[in-house]
């Protein structure tokens, strides 16, 4: 234990090397007439401590620091009437034993409110890694316990991140097929009968289109609040293919026109487009 001679004036002093972890603060202002006493047994009370130090001077006040539960932290402060009595105790600190236990005695120092900048303090200094009784790890640093939560693997959502309204509007999206058929209607004839035929349309002419209601597939689409839509997965549906037919008269090709709306779907409008058939008579 190394001790320094102290002057009565309350001037800042250099750090006092103390081996006990319950030692006095290392930086601050020395409090006159007061000493720090560490290594106190938890069974020792203030009256016992006063009686012991009264042998070396006139004791004014004795204070043992306790925790919130009232249990002694193992250190306290003794204030003497004069600085000379406190100085004498500091000089004889190595010789003082209480109940066969060596006391850790040093000057009483009041901590400075504005001390060393935080940037100059190493974060790892004074950090303790502990574990609770239930097995949760935490770090204790500067009087604050920091609990570490385990990492949770995030599961990506099955849909895009954009929000979808709680009551989506269903819009029917028609998917239809328009197969084209090229045909030539020919009839057998006997001698003496007329022969007639329907000419085959050329490649440049518009093909005949057949569209039946069974070929229309409706897929619901959800409309989001932000104006975007989330398309459902594409599903393939088997559709019936109409059989081509021929007529000897005038045929009309029907185109089914759709006017999709975000609210309702009107009935399909049938617009007939007459196509003329060219007749040829051979003798």
Swiss-Prot record:
Entries under PROSITE patterns matching the protein: DAZ (PS51890), RRM (PS50102)
Residue ranges constituting the RRM domain according to the UniProt record: 33-110
CC terms in the record's Gene Ontology section: cytoplasm
Chief location of this protein within or outside the cell: cytoplasm
Annotated keywords: Cytoplasm, Developmental protein, Differentiation, RNA-binding, Spermatogenesis, Translation regulation
GO aspect biological process, one term: cell differentiation
Domain of life per record: Eukaryota
Parts forming coiled coils: none
GO molecular function, one term: translation activator activity
Record localization: Cytoplasm
Tissues where this protein is expressed: Testis specific. Not expressed in early embryos, primordial germ cells and spermatogonial cells. First expressed in the cytoplasm of spermatocytes and then persists through meiosis.
Disordered: region residues: 1-25
Family per record: Belongs to the RRM DAZ family.
Assembly behavior: Interacts with DAZ1 and DAZL.
Protein name per the record: Protein boule-like
């Amino acid at each position: 234990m190394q001790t320094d001679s102290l002057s009565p004036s309350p001037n800042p002093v250099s750090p006092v090397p103390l081996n006990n972890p319950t030692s006095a603060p290392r930086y601050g202002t020395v409090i006159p007439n007061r000493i720090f006493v560490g290594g106190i047994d938890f069974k020792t009370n203030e009256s016992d401590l006063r009686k012991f130090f009264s042998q070396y001077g006139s004791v004014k006040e004795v204070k043992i620091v306790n925790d919130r539960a009232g249990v002694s932290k193992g250190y306290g402060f003794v204030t003497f009437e004069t600085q000379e009595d406190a100085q004498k105790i500091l000089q004889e600190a190595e010789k003082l034993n209480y109940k066969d236990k060596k006391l850790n005695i040093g000057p009483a120092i009041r901590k400075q409110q504005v001390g060393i900048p935080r940037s100059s303090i190493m974060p790892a200094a004074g950090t303790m890694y502990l574990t609770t009784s239930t097995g949760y790890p935490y770090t204790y640093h500067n009087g604050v316990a920091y609990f570490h939560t385990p990492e949770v693997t995030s599961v990506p959502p099955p849909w895009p991140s954009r929000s979808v309204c709680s009551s989506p509007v269903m819009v029917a999206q028609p998917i239809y097929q328009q197969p084209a058929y090229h045909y030539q209607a020919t009839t057998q004839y006997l001698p003496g009968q007329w022969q007639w035929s329907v000419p085959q349309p050329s490649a440049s002419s518009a093909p005949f289109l057949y569209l039946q209601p069974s070929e229309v597939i409706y897929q619901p689409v959800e409309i989001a609040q932000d104006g975007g839509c989330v398309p459902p997965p594409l599903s393939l549906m088997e559709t019936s293919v109409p059989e081509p037919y021929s007529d000897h008269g005038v045929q009309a090709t029907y185109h089914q026109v759709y006017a999709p709306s975000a609210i309702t779907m009107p009935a399909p409008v049938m617009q007939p487009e007459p196509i003329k058939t060219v007749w040829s008579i051979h003798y």
